[in-house]
Amino acid sequence: MDAVEQVLVAEREWLLAHLHLDIPALEQLMDPDYLQIGAGGDALDKEQVLASFRSGERHWDEAQSAEHHVRVYGNTAVVVGRWRARGENAGRSFDYQARFVSVWVRRDGEWRMVSDQSTPIA
């Protein structure tokens, strides 16, 4: 499997971990330096994101990801795509479609997400 395929597998695992609230999988996929930039400009580190899932504050009922464009630069990969998620965050229901950018690094042979950002679309 080449690097592009490996990153796409990691992206799929990321989506499924969110959908199934699989905290251990999320922890494994997130780099210690992970930083999420939300649509509103908020920045959350790895522990903040994991805490929001552990508390039940956030959960997804549906998730889809498509239109992936992957670029690999040595041990770094950038993925641009489109996703849709439906669920609840901080007590509020959402049905969200966005373009996203995620950045992955390969450490000890494993791809880890170091950052992701999404921008809402209609």
Question: Model-derived features: where do they sit?
Answer:
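A beta-strand edge to alpha-helix "cap/lid" segment located at domain peripheries
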Residues: 1-122
